[in-house]
């Protein structure tokens, strides 16, 4: 037996040794994504990159002409046969069938372009500044699956510059003060700002070097050619003092920053430029190696030192020459953003002179913002220089549904057929949302014989959406090019329209159409992680779309002197903000605490934690020192909405409702001061606000099947723990386990406490929890003669203890005995608990009753006394939430009965409580 084992191992080793590097890396990629699937990768030769796959026996055979082609083939298998989408976020699960899907007939595809670019300098600020290796590892795998082979790779360059500037006479203190804080580094690297939130800690500089080495190693192993930076003329102001004869001048002001943050530019025509370029590239090559691709931009959103065509031609020619003199194989990748952004100065004559000054084929232009303006059409295809057609799609990491699907599809076709594009890419400023649009654009780099409608239909399947959902989204919602924008909730409050161009909330579609599509998505009731992501992202947009009308009604009521009406509408506005905050909180990528915790992970001391947290707060709020870029990076995130946007709107509502006339100038001044104070304090955002709900759902059947509607209420309100009364479990009336079903729809854990056996199944109470359930109990309660048995479901999470009860509705004595049992059980098990303890449910008792009086001896009512029953004729309060007096105290933030949209879901209204811990 041992002999056979040795032979088997030997065969395995021989087969492994026979694998090509591309086959090994493709296998390693599959091992990280779908480790238990049986896949054989075969590298084959072809004149263009291509893939082909089919099932042979019990394994998938995947042929490809490169590791990139095999990765694209693997992604198509995942998309079309496993019906799954691999997220670019490391923490998102990959949902795949347990049984490996069979491919009966071979499927193939081939590359239409050889260059597939991804990323933007800004992405390293708006999304990636705090990433660790685990984040990069998943993202690089995602890029490989999409066929990306030219990733921008600018991490870690500060260490290179540190060594270079030391050689030119600067001290370490001067160098670190020249750098910005981590979140603002992209704009420092692009010669826009110096010193903002500096000095940069040495630990950050060193840590980024090690991270970049890991990034480049993995990208290269997957057949990518990382695009590294090169010197683009940006120098410290101190260099002008050290080299007074050099052609060093200040660049034009940028972003409203003061003179102390202004950048300085060394002209490429100066002899010192080549010396610095040589030193930079040699040190970068020593640390990171090279693939001979260099991405650098000389004039990103700043003026050139001269607008004379001959001068600019000389600058372009010398900039390229400085790189080529160090690396004769150098290829310059240059953003075409400047040609769009500053069309006033970059005239056709100047663009032609600038581009033609570089040897033909040695510079490739990224046509940056084609969904708005394909610059290749305005420049005679960049005067013969190769270019990559790019979709931008997101500014500032904004979380808004945007992107012209049909228009961009047509423009891609035009660029490939008529424009001679040599590549396709994406230049998103931040990840934000709308990931599917980037997946679509990158898929167009390959000929896969799939129409747009077929691609959208496949998107339905892998997003677990209703059939035709994404086609409707593409045709009705995704109509306009993205811009710097957001929802009005994220804007500084104003009386009408929007306060700033940075949060332009124009909606190019009928919001009612999105409401209808969102309802379809909810009713479909998927239970996958990607479905829940869509629900949160689209749902936040739905809630955001409702806000402008409320603001307009509020302002109109105030101006008309109808203060009571205005106050009521103001409460609605605050509640809508709270709902959006709660809904965003269901997704980790939409949480401010995730952003801040990631920043803090780079710290080596409490002082550094505060420093990194400030950098993280600064970018996504005020951005700069003046109001020029305030809210540019707005995003409807949990925690950011609660602790930043909502206080602004509360201040606005209070000022409008005050007895004194509203002073808009004073409000904006005070609002700016409040914003600056929050950023300076850089508070910790955590799960400090918890939302509880109790709901007698009547087996989800009082008015037809109400489960999807109730799940929607829970999701919109952001309830993290929900108590349910009157649940069926696998009985003849409802053959499914109702609690497990609704928990699955929401992605929650659950615990059921059977009260009685019923119709060959069970009936009772239950709890669902968004966070892990650490302990659970099912407690039987005393039974009255002739009455149904009763039970109590108890769960303990990291945040609290939460119990669900449904007390007897017939016998007085039995009800009192049930309360006595409950009180005794908690005294024995949770007396003096360091967590809050809650008792929720349908008590079948009025507030003034003896039963509630007995409960109140041990418990404090925290949910109010509004009517909860019945939904047809509300006249009783019998559903409550209590907090245990002998446990950790809480501060109630709000408590209410939810009547809006719940009158046909059950005969009881749900009760909602928001609280935070008292410290």
Per-range role (PLM):
Residues 721, 725-801, 807, 889-901:
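Structured beta-strand-rich core segments of catalytic domains in phosphoester-bond hydrolases
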């Amino acid at each position: 037996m041992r002999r056979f084992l040795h032979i088997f191992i030997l065969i395995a080793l021989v087969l492994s040794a026979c694998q090509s590097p591309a086959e090994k890396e493709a296998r390693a990629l599959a091992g990280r994504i779908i480790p238990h699937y049986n896949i054989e990768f075969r590298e084959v030769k072809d004149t263009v990159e291509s893939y082909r796959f089919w099932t042979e026996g019990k394994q998938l055979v995947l042929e490809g002409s490169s590791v990139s082609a095999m990765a694209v083939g693997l992604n198509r298998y995942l998309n079309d046969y496993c019906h799954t989408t691999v997220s670019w976020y490391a923490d998102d699960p990959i949902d795949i069938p347990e049984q490996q899907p069979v491919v009966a007939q071979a499927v193939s595809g081939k590359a239409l372009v050889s260059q597939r670019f991804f990323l933007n300098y800004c992405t390293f600020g708006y999304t990636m500044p705090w990433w660790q290796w685990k984040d990069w590892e998943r993202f690089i795998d995602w890029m490989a699956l999409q066929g990306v082979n030219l990733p921008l790779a600018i991490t870690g360059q500060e260490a290179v510059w540190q060594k270079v500037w030391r050689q030119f006479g600067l001290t370490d203190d001067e160098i670190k003060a020249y750098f910005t804080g981590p979140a603002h580094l992209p704009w420092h690297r692009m010669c826009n700002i110096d010193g903002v939130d500096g000095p940069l800690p040495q630990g950050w500089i060193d840590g980024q070097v090690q991270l970049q080495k890991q990034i480049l190693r993995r990208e290269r192993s997957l057949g990518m050619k990382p695009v590294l930076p090169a010197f683009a003329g940006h120098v410290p102001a101190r260099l002008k003092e050290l080299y007074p004869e050099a052609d060093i001048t200040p660049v034009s002001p940028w972003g409203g920053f003061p003179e102390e943050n202004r950048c300085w530019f060394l002209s490429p025509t100066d002899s010192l430029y080549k010396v610095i370029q040589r030193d930079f590239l040699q040190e970068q090559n020593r640390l990171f190696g090279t693939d001979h691709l260099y991405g650098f931009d000389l004039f990103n959103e700043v003026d050139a030192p001269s607008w004379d065509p001959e001068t600019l031609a000389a600058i372009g020619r010398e900039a390229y020459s400085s790189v080529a003199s160090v690396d004769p194989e150098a290829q310059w990748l240059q953003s075409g953003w400047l040609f769009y952004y500053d069309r006033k100065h970059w005239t056709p004559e100047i663009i032609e002179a600038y581009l033609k000054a570089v040897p033909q084929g040695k510079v490739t232009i990224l046509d940056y913002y084609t969904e708005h303006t394909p610059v290749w059409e305005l420049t005679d295809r960049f005067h013969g220089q190769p270019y990559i057609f790019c979709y931008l799609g997101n500014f500032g990491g904004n979380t808004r549904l945007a992107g012209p699907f049909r228009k961009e599809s047509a423009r891609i076709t035009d660029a490939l057929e008529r424009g001679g594009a040599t590549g396709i890419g994406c230049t998103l400023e931040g990840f934000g949302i709308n990931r599917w649009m980037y997946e679509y654009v990158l898929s167009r780099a390959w000929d896969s014989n799939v129409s747009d409608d077929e691609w959208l239909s496949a998107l339905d399947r892998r997003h677990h959406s209703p059939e035709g959902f994404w086609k409707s989204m593409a045709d009705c919602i995704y109509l306009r090019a993205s811009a710097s924008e957001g929802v009005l909730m994220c804007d500084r409050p104003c009386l009408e329209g929007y306060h700033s161009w940075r949060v332009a909330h124009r909606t190019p579609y009928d919001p009612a159409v999105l409401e209808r599509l969102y309802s379809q998505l909810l009713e479909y009731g998927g239970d996958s992680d990607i479905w829940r992501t869509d629900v949160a992202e689209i749902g936040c947009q739905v809630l955001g779309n409702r806000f402008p009308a409320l603001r307009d009604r509020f302002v109109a009521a105030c101006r008309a002197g109808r203060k009571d009406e205005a106050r009521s509408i103001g409460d609605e506005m605050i509640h809508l903000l709270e709902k959006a905050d709660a809904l965003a909180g269901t997704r980790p990528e939409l949480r401010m605490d995730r952003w801040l915790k990631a920043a803090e992970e780079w710290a080596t001391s409490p002082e550094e934690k505060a420093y990194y947290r400030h950098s993280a707060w600064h970018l996504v709020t005020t951005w700069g020192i003046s109001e020029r870029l305030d809210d540019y990076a707005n995003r409807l995130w949990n925690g950011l909405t609660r602790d930043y946007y909502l206080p602004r709107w509360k201040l606005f509502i209070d000022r409008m409702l005050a007895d004194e006339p509203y002073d808009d100038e004073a409000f904006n001044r005070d609002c700016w001061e409040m914003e600056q104070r929050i950023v300076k304090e850089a508070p910790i955002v955590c799960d400090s606000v918890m939302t509880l709900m109790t709901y007698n759902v009547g087996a989800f059947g009082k008015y037809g099947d109400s489960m999807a509607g109730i799940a929607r209420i829970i999701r919109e309100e952001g309830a993290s723990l929900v108590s349910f009364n009157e649940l069926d479990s696998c009985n003849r009336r409802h053959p499914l386990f109702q609690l497990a079903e609704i928990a699955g729809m929401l992605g929650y854990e659950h615990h059921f406490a059977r009260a009685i056996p019923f119709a060959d199944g069970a009936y009772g109470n239950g709890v669902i929890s968004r966070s892990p359930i650490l302990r659970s109990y099912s407690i039987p309660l005393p039974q009255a003669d002739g009455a149904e048995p009763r039970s109590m479901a108890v769960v303990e999470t990291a945040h609290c203890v939460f119990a669900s009860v449904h007390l007897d509705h017939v016998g007085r004595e039995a009800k009192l005995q049930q309360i006595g049992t409950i009180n005794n059980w908690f005294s024995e098990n949770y007396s003096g608990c360091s967590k809050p303890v809650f008792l929720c449910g349908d008590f079948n008792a009025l507030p003034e009753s003896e039963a509630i009086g007995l409960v109140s001896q041990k418990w404090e009512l925290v949910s109010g006394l509004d009517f909860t029953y019945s939904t047809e004729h509300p006249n009783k309060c019998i559903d409550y939430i209590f907090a245990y007096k002998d446990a950790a105290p809480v501060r109630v933030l709000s408590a209410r009965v939810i009547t809006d949209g719940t009158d046909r879901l059950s005969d009881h209204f749900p009760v909602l409580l928001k609280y935070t811990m008292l410290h």
